Structures are given as C-alpha cells and as structure tokens.
Amino acid sequence: MFSLLSGTVLPNQWLSPADPYDRYGLNPGEPFAPAMKVSKMSKAPPAPPSLQELRVEIDSIDEQVHTLLMQRGDIIDRLIKVKQTQEVGSAFRPAREADMMRRLVQRHRGILPLDTVESIWRVIIATFTYVQAPFSVHADLSVGESAMRDSARFHFGFTVPFISHFNPSAAVEAVARSKGDLALVSATTNRMPWWLDLEAEGTPKIIARLPFVERADHPAALPVFVVSRVADSAMVTEVEMWSVRVSGWNADTARALSPLAEIVAVPDSAIDGAALLVSVTRATSLDKITSALIEAGASVRSSALVGSHATRYTVTSNGAA
C-alpha cells in the first residue's frame, strides 16, 4: 500500500482506515515515518536522582574518606613502632613522595582542580610525617613573606610549625642544629651563597624542589629548595645539586652555561670569583659544565655535591601532563 503522507510503500498490516493518526497518536498534518513507530512507543527515561539522594551519596563518600584517613593513621602508628626498632633517621622520604605525586597527577580526572588534589595529598604526607617524627619548617622570608608562607602552607599545612627567618643562612643553620627540621629557601635567586654551608660531610642537604607539580598558574608557584637531613636510601637523585666555586666569572661564562644547567650565582670574596649552585640533570654532567666554564675562560676552584631532587613534573594550566 502506498502512503500519501510519507511517499513510501507501507506494509498492509501497518495501516487501517484511521492510520496513521489514530493508531500512532499523530496529529493531522504531522509527517509519518516508520521510525516514528518506535519513538512514540518507547519508554520514558528514568527520572534523575533527587537532591536528597545525591547528598546521601556525598555523605557516604565523605565518611569513607575519613575512615580511610583514620585507617592510614593506624598504619602509621604501627610504622612508628617498627621504626623504633629497625630504622634510624628522618621520616622524610623524597623519592617515595615524588613517585606518589607523579602517580597522583597521572590518574587524576574530573572537575576537581588538580591544585586541590595536590595540596590535600601534600598536607596528608606532611602531617603523617610530622606524627611520626615532629619537625618544624624554617622559611627564609627575604624573597617575600607572602609567597613563602603560601608555599609552606600549601605543601605542609598548618599542623607543622612555621618558623620565620630573614636570610637563607639562618634557616639552614637552624636545620643544622635540629634533629629533623627542614628549611625552605629560594631556588632562583639569592644575595648570599647559603649552599656553601651544605658542602661538608654530615651537613643538611637539598632534598627537594617545590612545587614538584609545576604549571604557570600554580597557587604556590614560588620555586624553593627544601633542605634537611634524610637517609641516603631515601634521596632521589634525578637532578644533582653542586656547589661550584669559580674564578673568571662574567657575562660570557654565564651565557656559556645557560644551555647546560640552571644556575644561581653569587659573587664571592675572590676577585672576579663567584659561588655557583648548579643543577645537573641526567642530560648533562658536571664534567661538561666544568669544560664549558674552562672554554669560556673561567677556572674551577672547587666543587661539592650539596644535594639532589626529583625532576619537576610539568603540566599545562588545565592539569594535563
């Protein structure tokens, strides 16, 4: 049978004298197509959950998060007892923390900002470290009090005591006198070569660079080094930090090093001399840097390893790695 409404041949059993209007609930003038038979007879979609139902789900998740944190605390309590008999030294584990933060960023998805997730985990790590072995954060405020406080609170929270200092050497000296404290000092600029105090054996060392997850709009973007004492087995050595003292330091030698490494340079007491803090990645070496200095007309007076840290994990502003 030929349908005037659709211009197609329809099976006889689909039409009756009243079809398609009566049989399929169509209004006169409404076009008819076989596909409409399915759409008109399909079930309505299920109603969305109510606000109350969603709030119950959220409350349940919040309770689970709290329960898991308490369970983590129970494990830390057992860990403390084990460490009292099996381990000596600081509770900081820079290599483990770096691995944990990388995995956190890689698996993160959804609308929750990465900033929030990163800060929550940093505070969890710092607080449980503090519970294991109480420590204080000694911060050099000479680079800007507000930015340094933001960095300290973002990465260590409010449970860990915060102690202000007004030059980096004072912060490092306080850590040297302590049992397990740490210092935060600028990673990009300084007026004094504070890292010289890290050269001797047994002194504190650079153990981390923050923020570890680096992006342009980071809420605690001030680059800082973390200085403390940790077990050699706990260190991460992806980037080595070297204290290098040179003579013949000038703009030409600085330009010669810029493609090879990040450098903080401070003039020292020697004529045309400088104390350098050099970041040596796996893509280069101290020998290459020394050769570049010599080729540029400088001479190396001494060098000493003063710490190491993880390679920074860079993401875009929207959180993509």
Task: Show which residues each predicted segment covers.
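Domain-level signature for soluble enzymes in the chorismate/prephenate branch of the shikimate pathway
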Residues: F2-L4, W14-S16, Y21-A321
